[in-house]
Amino acid sequence: MAEITKADVVAFIEKMTVLELAELVKELEEKFGVSAAAPVAVAAAAPAAAAEAAEEKTEFDVILKSAGANKINVIKVVRTLTSLGLKEAKDLVDGAPSPVKTGISKAEAEEAQKQLVEAGAEVEIK
């Protein structure tokens, strides 16, 4: 039996009438349990959902981008903020960019950022 290529399928479909194409689409939808119209409706709703999520952000992450010149002071602040041991705090600072605190309130994130910046670190809130 000869192999059917994509080009053969396209050539066959080109010769079909609109009515035959509509019936083919309906049969394919039934056979595979899909709908040809669903992606259009979902794509239209997605941007609205994304906008709502951006407005309702309640949890923030404090990301240490770099320790700057005062690495020791930054390590001290990281230990205070996270209750990590000296080695763990040093590893976190050395591994920048890395998250210092995750899933915290905006006020807490801004306070942590303020303390880290005062110690000489470069910080980002996401």
Curated annotation (Swiss-Prot):
Fetch the HAMAP family from UniProt.
Answer: Ribosomal_bL12
Taxonomically, the superkingdom here is Bacteria
GO BP terms in the entry? translation
**CDD domains cross-referenced by the UniProt entry:** Ribosomal_L7_L12 (cd00387)
Q: Which organism is it from?
A: Trichlorobacter lovleyi (strain ATCC BAA-1151 / DSM 17278 / SZ) (Geobacter lovleyi)
Name of the protein in its database record: Large ribosomal subunit protein bL12
Concerning PANTHER family, the annotation shows: 39S RIBOSOMAL PROTEIN L12, LARGE RIBOSOMAL SUBUNIT PROTEIN BL12M
Family that this chain belongs to: Belongs to the bacterial ribosomal protein bL12 family.
Relate the assembly described in the record: Homodimer. Part of the ribosomal stalk of the 50S ribosomal subunit. Forms a multimeric L10(L12)X complex, where L10 forms an elongated spine to which 2 to 4 L12 dimers bind in a sequential fashion. Binds GTP-bound translation factors.
Q: Which Pfam families has this protein been placed in?
A: Ribosomal_L12, Ribosomal_L12_N
Give the Gene Ontology MF terms in alphabetical order: mRNA binding; structural constituent of ribosome
Coiled-coil residues are none
InterPro entries given in the database record: Ribosomal_bL12 (IPR000206), Ribosomal_bL12_C (IPR013823), Ribosomal_bL12_C/ClpS-like (IPR014719), Ribosomal_bL12_oligo (IPR008932), Ribosomal_bL12_oligo_N_sf (IPR036235)
Which key words are in the record? Ribonucleoprotein, Ribosomal protein
What this protein is reported to do is described as:
Forms part of the ribosomal stalk which helps the ribosome interact with GTP-bound translation factors. Is thus essential for accurate translation.
Q: Spell out the GO cellular component terms annotated for this protein, sorted alphabetically and separated by semicolons.
A: cytosolic large ribosomal subunit
